[in-house]
Amino acid sequence: MTNEIKATFDVTTLEGRMKILNAKNAGGASLKTCEDGAIIEAVGIAQYQQESDTYGDMKEETVTAIFTADGNVISAISKTVAEAASEIIDLVKEFNLDSFKVKVSKQKSSKGNEFFSLLLVG
């Protein structure tokens, strides 16, 4: 399992490591509980790998944790969320943003499956 953590904040500081530890241990609310179009006031996003047992198969998945301005964590295990969040992390770091707004987007695939994505909004 990969221990690499990608985040908008410094994960080598005590504060950064505490955020990751708390996200891993508490998990926070699921992104699935957010309404389509919900705006999250974020102060950080991090991604890390975890092993999950899916119907008897162990597989490594990317967890995306969004840290909110009010101290909560919203988490998701989703390929589309991970892809969007990875790009958001890059932009937030490039422009050195301390806080930013993320919009939750729920969509349906052609087969009727619901999936989520994230948008960076001003």
Curated annotation (Swiss-Prot):
<keyword id="KW-0244">Early protein</keyword>
<protein>
    <recommendedName>
        <fullName>Single-stranded DNA-binding protein</fullName>
    </recommendedName>
</protein>
<comment type="subunit">
    <text>Monomer. Binds to DNA.</text>
</comment>
<dbReference type="GO" id="GO:0039693">
    <property type="term" value="P:viral DNA genome replication"/>
</dbReference>
<keyword id="KW-0238">DNA-binding</keyword>
<dbReference type="InterPro" id="IPR035408">
    <property type="entry name" value="Phi29_Phage_SSB"/>
</dbReference>
<dbReference type="GO" id="GO:0003677">
    <property type="term" value="F:DNA binding"/>
</dbReference>
<comment type="similarity">
    <text>Belongs to the phi29likevirus single-strand-binding protein family.</text>
</comment>
<keyword id="KW-0235">DNA replication</keyword>
<dbReference type="GO" id="GO:0006260">
    <property type="term" value="P:DNA replication"/>
</dbReference>
<comment type="function">
    <text>Single-stranded DNA-binding protein required for the elongation during viral DNA replication by strand displacement. Displaced viral DNA strands are transiently coated with the ssDNA-binding protein and therefore protected againt nucleases. The latter is then probably removed by the replisome that performs lagging strand synthesis or during the events that lead up to the recombination process. Has helix-destabilizing activity since it removes secondary structure from the ssDNA in replicative intermediates.</text>
</comment>
<keyword id="KW-1194">Viral DNA replication</keyword>
<dbReference type="Pfam" id="PF17427">
    <property type="entry name" value="Phi29_Phage_SSB"/>
</dbReference>
